[in-house]
Amino acid sequence: EAEKCBZZPGWTKGGCETCGCAQKIVPCTRETKPNPQCPRKQCCIASAGFVRDAQGNCIKFEDCPK
């Protein structure tokens, strides 16, 4: 289950969000800004093994389409 989003986009204690299955790990700092192509809040945490699918759902990386 993905963490709940907080109101501040760009960083959570869990790490940073990627836009999708092609970007498994993205370096993340407290200054990380949301990807302009990925306007959702940062709550689908890449370092926890989650990514967004094409519909914007937060899924486990291993569940990405092969």
From Swiss-Prot:
GO terms for cellular component: extracellular region. One of its GO terms (molecular function) is serine-type endopeptidase inhibitor activity. Disulfide bonds join C5-C28, C16-C44, C19-C58, C21-C38, C43-C64. The keyword Cytoplasm does not apply. It is found in: Secreted. This is Trypsin inhibitor. It comes from Ascaris suum (Pig roundworm). Keywords: Disulfide bond, Protease inhibitor, Secreted, Serine protease inhibitor. Its main location: secreted. It comes from the Eukaryota. The lineage of its organism: Eukaryota, Metazoa, Ecdysozoa, Nematoda, Chromadorea.
